[in-house]
Amino acid sequence: MSNLSAEGFQRCFVLHRRPYSESSLILDVFSEEYGRITLMAKGARSKRSNLKGALQPFTPLLLKWSGKGSMKTLRQAEPISLGLPLFGINLYSAMYVNELVGRVLMAEVPMPALFHDYLHALTELAQCENPEPALRRFELALLSSMGYGVDFLHCAGTGEPVDPEMTYRYREQKGFIASVRRDNLTFLGNELIAISERRFVTKEQLKAAKRFTRIALKPYLGGKPLKSRELFIQTPRARSNGK
């Protein structure tokens, strides 16, 4: 059993929360120094609890906990600020980011750099009109943090720099090789350069980045669909039906 007690307050975000017993919560938390952890917040749902409104996703928190085993006990919690203003498609996008972190990261593995990427992604989602670039940058940061090393700038077959106008086919764990075919696994050189720089000038480059991250993340997510994606897909139908 792990003894991962926080000696002082730790910067955290709640990824997901669910009720436990009559008055408590189980929290899936992403912490700056300890990675993803699970906390029991005893009495957090009771009417007298001052934590009831604070332990929400997208609210920057300072948390202190103790205990052994896979589930720790929350001892103290203080909000750093109000929750980030996320609405509409940007809210669903932030929910997707939370679900990715909860599904992909192993428990209790420190990821301080990714925590900052996560914070930057949420901040960007709270301010932007189009969430797609922020999502692609975070997905690429997540893959990089897990050691998913892909060279976007060189042909895996020859070692030569990619040509912006040429087509390259992705081969898992190998990289990109020159190809004359065009399908779901092929990308233009300028798209690979854009993905490497995480800077998307055209819609085509942004679509290519989305296609690549879906391919790369699929083994980590398994066959279980993402709930946030399903909710987002259902939303336009609900609106058209007047719900």
From Swiss-Prot:
Top-level lineage group: Bacteria
Record key words, sorted: DNA damage, DNA recombination, DNA repair
Pfam families: RecO_C, RecO_N
Swiss-Prot/TrEMBL GO biological process terms: DNA recombination; double-strand break repair
Ranges annotated as spanning the membrane: none
Any one annotated GO CC term: bacterial nucleoid
Function per UniProt: Involved in DNA repair and RecF pathway recombination.
PANTHER family in the cross-refs: DNA REPAIR PROTEIN RECO
Homology family: Belongs to the RecO family.
Protein name: DNA repair protein RecO
Organism: Vibrio parahaemolyticus serotype O3:K6 (strain RIMD 2210633)
